[in-house]
A protein has these predicted regions:
Chain A
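The canonical Cys-X-X-Cys-His
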Residues: 49, 55-64, 176-180
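Sequence context of c-type cytochrome heme-c attachment sites
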Residues: 28-37, 47-48, 63, 85, ...
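Electrostatic cytochrome c docking/interface patches
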Residues: 30-54, 66-74, 79, 101-103, ...
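Post-cleavage N-terminal segment of exported redox proteins
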Residues: 1-42, 177-206
Length: 206, 536, 396
């Protein structure tokens, strides 16, 4: 350990090896997967909504990767079947998430399909769930005296409604909800799909 | 495909094991030409055996600082060259700590006061939390870590810092980059991946700034005045080679997508901790612990094992963040196995650090910086053990997606790296300014505030996270249970966090006072002979 | 100052560290070797799920026993006055497309078989049987009961399936004869009495809401078919739906969203919505998705498990779990996430409104695997056909 260049070269070689294993090899395997049959590319509006999802930092409380029923009861909570690599073929950036301060959202479009519900919930989550700790997003909405043609007026319980006028959704909110509604992966996963099967129940497949 | 992957997988792990076995054989058969004597590299002649500390109560008297400096005559010249760069970097780092931890506290409070500060987009939880992370990682820890390295590296290499102006330019650019990144995040423009939020356009600036740090340090190492590279130097050289590559590869735009991008994301994010912050922290601890105590580390051969095993195993643990996710089984298993193998380097480093301190417990009483640093070293051991256990599939099922992970991340980045940096700054600044700290009683105050605050933070959030995880795994309990059960612990976390922030503000104010004090009075300790130190 | 401690010049790596390293390495090798097996099991589970969704492992005779014999009887004799016989049925003697179209769409109207007229309430099996299943089943049934052996192809079924989703059930034998095969002979006309009158007020409530809450259809779908944890409402008993809405208000049944909705509804609204959904027909969009064991699920649904004190589902919810008005809802074609969530809700107490609190005890005796098995199996059953009492609950 008296020479710097061999030290640096060895250190870099180890990192190169790690990069091969963790970046390049998985890339080759995942890229060879075709999108899951039934998966649709995002529309322009859904993509704008996805940008909102990133900008507001939804990812820090919501995952998009239901676990297998062998590991956790995600499917029974309505969060959907265990996701596989090819379900994310159109995702850029990936939004897998690592926290579940709120529920997983990979199938929120299937289990909560109502646009009106989502708008209310974004404006004030505690209007629906008293226990919720999700931030309210009033800045995605505006208050108007009267709704104009084309405005989407949100439904609020009497104790949350403004004293005067109506609350209408801004375009950002409508886009975000369009993205959430698009999160519906209720089609089956291919048999050979790629995912972490490390929790698959040991023993004979039934 | 299965066969090839299985083969690749096996080969990879066997390669690591083989390298480890070879290393152990080489160390035990003295094939590597290092000896315990090399551990004395950090001392000047006659210095070993004497504690070196300028913050102890005993040294606050008139002769204290002078006595410490008595052993640093040669280095005083070295220190003077790196002083402007070190001061710039560390003061920037501390500024980011103050701002970043306030954002952390706001984010923490918002989790249990969800209707607080919701009117403005930039104050929403998702952005405030992200500002906190980026400020403390890229602002506080990275800049302070580099600043400490700028001060330590010339000392272990027995020569002055090369290109000492470059780091100052680098620090300015880096500050601009982190600030621009923060503004981008606050305004809703980010790259969408954890730890990689700063837009890649701004990352270019940060990368350029980084090269202004790497170049002087590597040049200094290359032209050292001592044959042996002290263990701290291994960590620094390796980290300086690793981080630019990590940062560059992970930030390449447009080429990644979907789950494949997620593997790049976590390969990067964990390596920021493992191959960047950890070497900066462990390297600093390897210097300061023996330096303050005045005795070499316990076993120099163990430090070799600790270093190379860290490189071999830490570099492949990242995918344990995606356990149970939509990534190939083999890459998850590979990361789990490597995570568990991390016990080896951590035990090696732990023996070295803790035995050295345990044999000299008197020094803990005498030196607050040593208290910070050796407590930081203990937290490194704990955080690493915890991380290895957390990577086990059975444990991960409970802790993944919960606040437990947040507590763990803070044990590593705060309990370990930040504590080491606190201690390093307390040790270094009197030597940089040539004066004692102006308010010595504020140092233990800072120590106890962050220790107590962090204990509240960590214990509370860990318990809360486990309860949250069990609630989520129990299908008979609605999801709302997992939210309600963790809520009191989020409040406890805010309490602990607030105490920590008070500690940080005291630290920042004290640091500022120490700097202003220097400007008010002419520096007392001018280098005796600068030329002899820099001549090559 | 402390005195200088003597250090050895050289220390080998301590033995305990070596032992730990070797032990961890062995564990690592073992774990990696285990990896391949996990992938095999995972694939088998996914392939089972796909197979479950298409039930394509049964031959024609087995399909007949599991899907048809409950009503049409194992010997195809039917039930006098209620279920038409298959033996010598003109519908089977006709071209194979007739049986295929009936299986895909179901029948909702009177048909004549031999000398008897039956009020037809056959469910659609489109969601239950794959193209190949239908070919096997039609071939078996026509060969066995009508001695006809001309073949149907999977392509024919696939083409017909595209239309089936759009057109709904056949409105009695007359429509089948007119559209598919005139050789069926004279068939009874659709009587206007069975034609449900659509309640415009209910329709507005369902599709647009009442201005104070979200429209029912925005979650439950325009055809009341639901998805994932949103239940299918089409074909549930009217009184059952109205009671649930009332129970949300009183808190006997808890669900934050539905409690908000129900509080905005007047009792007469609740009855109107119940009536509206009770006569609604929608193809099934449910499928087994919890990884439950369908064989076990079928046994629990049809026979129960008396060793564990579990009665069969059909004993209360009626044959084929099509429901028994007013109190027992249809379970067939319900989304398994919803069914499973209700079964856990009976245990946790967030739902406590079943007749005689029967469900509390039953649900408590189901373990995780059984709950998933039952929920998944119910999802594979055909949706409830037209209720015999339709139109009457409107009170007109």
């Amino acid at each position: 350990m008296n020479r710097m260049v061999p030290l640096a070269i060895l250190a870099l070689a180890i990192l190169a090896f790690a990069t091969l294993m963790l970046v390049i090899a998985p890339a080759i395997q995942i890229r060879s997967e075709a999108p899951t049959p039934g998966l649709k590319p995002y529309t322009a509006q859904q993509l704008r909504g996805r940008t909102q999802y990133v900008a507001q930092g939804c990812i820090y409380c919501h995952s998009q990767q239901p676990r297998s029923i062998d590991q956790a009861p995600d499917a029974e909570r309505g969060w959907g079947r265990a996701s596989v690599a090819s379900d994310y073929a159109y995702d850029r950036p990936h939004l897998l998430g690592t926290m579940r301060t709120g529920p997983d959202l990979f199938n929120v479009g299937a289990r909560l399909p109502s646009r009106g519900w989502h708008l209310t919930h974004l404006y004030q989550p505690r209007a629906i769930f008293g226990w919720s700790i999700m931030p309210a997003y009033p800045y995605l909405f505006e208050r108007k005296e009267h709704a104009e043609p084309g405005d989407v007026v949100i439904i609020l319980p009497a104790d949350r409604a403004p004293k005067k006028g109506v609350i209408v959704a801004k375009r950002e909110a409508l886009d975000l909800v369009a993205y959430l509604q698009s999160l519906d992966h209720t089609f089956p996963a291919p048999t050979r799909a790629v995912r972490d099967d490390g929790y698959a129940e040991k023993g004979e497949p039934r | 495909m299965t066969l090839t992957i299985g083969l690749l997988l096996g080969l990879s792990f066997f390669a690591s094991l083989l390298a480890l076995a070879f290393l152990i054989w080489a160390v035990n058969n003295r094939q590597l030409t290092i000896t315990q004597h090399d551990a004395y590299t950090i001392f000047t002649e006659g210095e070993a055996g004497h504690p070196d500390d300028a913050t102890t109560e005993g040294s606050q008297d008139e002769g204290g600082a002078a006595r410490a400096h008595h052993f640093d005559t040669e280095r005083a010249g070295i220190d003077a060259i790196s002083r402007p760069a070190v001061v710039t970097l560390i003061s920037s780092g501390i500024a980011w700590l103050a701002i970043g931890s306030i954002f952390g506290l706001i984010a923490s409070l918002k989790l249990h006061w969800p209707d607080w500060l919701v009117g403005e987009a930039w104050l929403t939880f998702g952005r405030v939390r992200t500002l906190h992370l980026n400020m403390v990682i890229y602002g506080w820890l990275s800049m302070t870590g580099i600043g400490v390295a700028m001060w330590v590296a010339p000392r272990i290499f027995h020569t002055a810092l090369r290109y000492p102006k470059l780091p100052i330019i680098g620090a300015i650019l880096w500050n601009v980059g982190v600030a621009a990144g923060a503004i981008a995040i606050a305004s809703g423009w980010n790259d969408g991946q954890e730890w990689l939020e700063i837009p890649w356009q701004i990352d270019i600036l940060i990368a350029i700034a980084g090269s202004f740090f790497v170049l002087p340090l590597l040049a200094t190492a290359a032209r050292r005045h001592v044959k042996h590279i002290y263990v701290t130097g291994w960590y620094y050289i390796a980290a300086l080679c690793w981080f630019p590559i990590l940062f560059f590869i992970a930030n390449i735009p447009y080429i990644y997508s979907g789950v494949q991008e997620a593997t790049v994301n976590w390969w990067f994010a964990h390596n920021v901790l493992g191959l960047w912050l950890t070497p900066l922290g462990v390297g600093a601890a390897y210097y300061f612990i023996p330096k303050i105590i005045g005795k070499p580390i316990y076993s120099y051969s163990l430090s070799l094992l600790g270093f190379w095993a860290l490189a071999l195993f830490y570099s492949q643990v990242g995918i344990h963040h995606l356990i149970g996710g939509p990534v190939p089984t083999w890459v998850v298993t590979l990361s789990i196995v490597h995570s568990v193998m991390m016990f080896v380097p951590v035990i090696a480093v732990a023996i070295n650090h803790h035995v050295t301190v345990a044999r000299n417990l008197w020094a803990l009483k005498a030196s607050v910086p040593l208290r910070f640093i050796s407590l930081g070293a203990v937290m490194y051991t704990l955080a690493s053990f915890q991380g290895s256990i957390e990577a086990l599939r059975s444990v991960n099922s409970v802790t993944h997606f919960t606040q437990y992970t947040v507590a763990h991340a803070h044990l590593g980045a705060y309990g370990f790296v930040s504590f080491v940096m606190f201690g390093a700054v307390y040790h270094m600044l009197p030597r940089i300014t040539g004066r004692s700290w102006p308010w010595p009683s504020m140092i233990p105050a800072h120590f106890w505030l962050v220790v107590v605050g962090f204990a509240i933070y960590f214990i509370g959030l860990t318990i809360g996270g486990v309860l949250q995880g069990f609630a989520m795994l129990d299908v008979a309990r609605p999801f709302s249970d997992s939210v309600q059960v963790v809520l009191p612990y989020l409040e406890i976390r805010s309490l602990g966090g607030a105490v920590m922030v008070v500690g940080h503000l005291i630290f920042a104010a004290h640091f500022l006072a120490a700097l202003i004090q220097r400007d008010a009075q002419a520096p007392a300790a001018q280098p005796h002979d600068t030329r002899s130190a820099v001549s090559t | 100052m402390e005195s200088f401690e003597p250090y050895e010049e050289f220390k080998p790596i301590p033995l305990p560290v070596l032992i730990i390293a070797v032990a961890l390495a062995l564990w690592g090798v073992f774990t990696l070797l285990d990896n391949g097996k996990a992938v095999t099991v995972g694939r088998a589970e996914r392939s089972d799920q796909i197979a479950d969704q298409h039930a394509n492992r049964q031959n024609g005779a087995e399909l007949f026993v599991s899907r048809c014999a409950t009503c049409h009887q194992p010997n195809g004799s039917g039930v006098e006055g209620a279920i038409p016989p298959l033996a010598s049925s003109p519908f089977l003697k006709a071209s194979p497309e007739v049986a295929m179209h009936i299986l895909l769409n179901g029948i909702d109207g009177p048909i004549r078989v031999g000398d008897a007229t039956f009020e037809g309430h056959m469910p659609s099996f489109a969601s239950v049987l794959s193209d190949a299943d239908i070919v096997r089943l039609v071939t078996h049934v026509r060969g066995t009961f009508a001695d006809r052996h001309d073949l149907l192809t999977e392509g024919d079924v696939a083409t017909a399936r595209l239309l089936a989703g759009r057109r709904g059930a056949w409105q009695g034998g007359q429509e089948i004869a007119a559209r598919l095969d005139a050789s069926l002979g004279p068939q009874p006309p659709m009587s206007s009495a069975t034609q449900a009158a659509i309640d415009p007020i209910a329709q507005k409530l369902v599709s647009q809401g009442n201005g104070q809450t979200w429209a029912c259809a925005s979650c439950h779908g325009m055809r009341g078919q639901g998805s994932a944890s949103v239940p299918r409402l089409a074909g549930l008993p009217a009184a059952y739906i109205a009671k649930q809405l009332g129970d949300y208000v009183t808190g006997k049944r808890r669900n934050e969203t539905m409690q908000l909705v129900a509080r905005t509804l007047k009792p007469q609204d609740m009855r109107r919505i119940g009536d509206y959904y009770s006569v609604m027909r929608a193809p099934s969009n449910a499928r087994a998705s919890l990884g439950g064991d369908l064989v076990r699920g079928e046994r629990l649904v049809l026979d129960g498990d008396w060793a564990r004190g579990l009665p069969s589902c059909v004993s209360c919810h009626g044959p084929s779990t099509f429901g028994v008005a007013p109190s027992f809802p249809a379970l067939s074609a319900q989304h398994p996430e919803y069914t499973a969530a209700q079964l856990t809700a009976w245990v946790s107490g967030t739902r406590d409104n079943s007749t005689g609190r029967l469900m509390n005890g039953i649900a408590a005796r189901l373990n995780d695997a059984d709950r998933r098995a039952v929920a998944d199996y119910l999802a594979t059953l055909p949706p409830v056909p037209a209720p015999a009492t339709r139109g009457r609950t409107n009170g007109k």
